[in-house]
Every structure is written in C-alpha cells, then in structure tokens.
A protein has these predicted regions:
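Internal, hydrophobic cores of structured domains that mediate oligomerization or house catalytic pockets
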Residues: 1-75
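Aromatic/basic-lined ligand-recognition segments
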Residues: 48-169
C-alpha cells in the first residue's frame, strides 16, 4: 500500500491563467509518468487524491471543478474557537482565505462560506480581485444577501480585540 511505497514523484507546477486547465495537465502528467500510481499527494491543497480519481480526472474531457483546486481546513483551539483556512489558492495566484474565531456552532456554515467564496474567486480568475471587489455569493433563507469582502489579515486583525496569535503569551 501507500505506506510501504519506496518511490515518490513530486510535480511542482505554477498554475497560469486557467487554473483548471493547469491542474488537469498536472493530473495528466502524474498519471502518464506513473500509470500504476497508488495515489497523489496534492501538497499545495494538503490532501491525498485516490489513484482511481486521478486516473478518471486525467482521462476526462471535462476539466476538474474549482473545488478540486483547494481544501478548507479547520483548527480548533481553546474556548471552542476554530480557525478556518484554505490551502491551494496561492498556486492559482490567489490569496489563501481564512476566518478567524469561528466556533463549534458555526464552523460548518463558515466552511461552506469559505468553499463557495474560494470557488467564486477561482471561477472568476484574474477578472476578479478580492482585495478590491466584494462578491455576492448567495442568499440566506430569510432573503438577506451573502456578500463577502476579503481583507488583508494585517488590517482585519484589529477587529479582533482579544485574539492572541501564536500562543498564550
């Protein structure tokens, strides 16, 4: 199995204008070089891809979804606080996204929010700059719009009065 493998192949690829095409090419290269692969570690997105999925995606005429280009991770801390963040966006020339101080009651909603916003950014590509434009990404059950604004963490950090980064002291 995968844990007993003695060889590994690393492919590093900076994605160009069309991130989905670049990712598809990366999967095709991995599948062609190692046709009997056990799996692919997508290091940028920090996730394992099953060999069967890689083979199907590489041989498909349909490009992978934008949701395949990144992952959303949740790190829980004290007081039920959860730090949510993406991995894989920077290879697409986009900023990684995060939500600080989510909580146990809302982290699933925040996971969906980050996922939808990341897909929105990737699908828009270079035509959209999240640092300048807001994005309407949906509507709540009560009819209120969901509008997302991306802010640099160096600015947004001041909105968290009691937040401590990097440890307890």
């Amino acid at each position: 199995g995968l844990l007993n493998a003695r060889l590994a192949l690393t492919i590093y690829m900076e994605f160009k204008k069309n991130a989905k095409k670049s990712y598809h090419l990366q999967l095709k290269i991995a599948n062609a070089i190692v046709p009997e692969l056990l799996g692919v570690l997508d290091e940028s997105a920090e996730r394992m891809l099953p060999a069967r999925w890689v083979n199907l995606a590489a041989n498909s005429k349909v490009l992978p979804s934008s949701k395949d280009l990144f992952s959303v991770q949740a790190v829980s801390g004290k007081n039920s606080k959860v730090w949510m963040h993406t991995h894989g966006m920077t290879r697409c020339h986009m900023t990684e996204l995060e939500i600080l101080e989510s909580d146990q009651a809302n982290y699933n909603n925040h996971f969906n929010l980050l996922s939808i916003y990341a897909m929105y950014c990737l699908d828009k590509g270079e035509a959209f700059d999240p640092r300048i434009e807001s994005a309407y990404i949906g509507q709540l059950i009560n009819g209120y719009p969901v509008v997302v604004t991306c802010r640099s963490w160096t600015e947004a950090i001041f909105e968290y009065k009691k937040l401590q980064l990097g440890g307890e002291k």
